[in-house]
C-alpha cells in the first residue's frame, strides 16, 4: 500500500517521501518514461518494473504486513501477491537509502517533458 511504502521510505532515508520522491526524475511517482536520471531515479524504475511483475492485485492499494527489526524491513507471511509487493517496496526503500549521497535536489520536481530519451525495458 502506498502509505506503507511511504513509511518504509521515511524510515530508511529520513526524508519526507512525498516531497522528496513523488516527483523525482523521470520514474518516481506516477508513470515513467525515458532514461532514469540517476541512481535514485533508477530505484523508481526498478520499483515500477517490480510492480509490473506482480499480477492479480493492485500493488498500490493492497495492504501487506511488515515489521522493522533492528532497522531492517521484514516482510510478513502474507499471501504471495502481497508479500511480493512488500518485497518490491522494501527493495526500493533500501535503494533510496543506499543512494542518498547522490540524491540531487534539481531532480526533485523534474518536469517529465524533459524525459525524452528512449524508454528502457524492464
From Swiss-Prot:
InterPro entries: PLipase_A2 (IPR001211), PLipase_A2_dom (IPR016090), PLipase_A2_dom_sf (IPR036444), PLipase_A2_His_AS (IPR033113). It is found in: Secreted. The keyword Transferase does not apply. One of its GO terms (biological process) is lipid catabolic process. It comes from the Eukaryota. Keywords: Calcium, Disulfide bond, Hydrolase, Lipid degradation, Lipid metabolism, Metal-binding, Secreted, Toxin. Binds 1 Ca(2+) ion. The active site is at 47, 89. Pfam families: Phospholip_A2_1. It catalyses: a 1,2-diacyl-sn-glycero-3-phosphocholine + H2O = a 1-acyl-sn-glycero-3-phosphocholine + a fatty acid + H(+). PLA2 catalyzes the calcium-dependent hydrolysis of the 2-acyl groups in 3-sn-phosphoglycerides. This is Basic phospholipase A2 PL-X. It comes from Protobothrops flavoviridis. The lineage of its organism: Eukaryota, Metazoa, Chordata, Craniata, Vertebrata.
Amino acid at each position: 500500500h502506498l502509505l506503507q511504502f511511504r513509511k518504509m521510505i521515511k524510515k530508511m532515508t529520513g526524508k519526507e517521501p512525498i516531497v522528496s520522491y513523488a516527483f523525482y526524475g523521470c520514474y518516481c511517482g506516477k508513470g515513467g518514461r525515458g532514461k532514469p536520471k540517476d541512481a535514485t531515479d533508477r530505484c523508481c524504475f526498478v520499483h515500477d518494473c517490480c510492480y509490473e511483475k506482480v499480477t492479480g492485485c493492485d500493488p498500490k492499494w493492497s495492504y501487506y504486513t511488515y515489521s522493522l527489526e533492528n532497522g531492517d524491513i521484514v516482510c510478513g507471511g502474507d499471501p504471495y501477491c502481497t508479500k511480493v509487493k512488500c518485497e518490491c517496496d522494501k527493495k526500493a526503500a533500501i535503494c533510496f537509502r543506499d543512494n542518498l549521497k547522490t540524491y540531487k535536489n534539481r531532480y526533485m520536481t523534474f518536469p517529465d517533458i524533459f524525459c525524452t530519451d528512449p524508454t528502457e525495458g524492464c
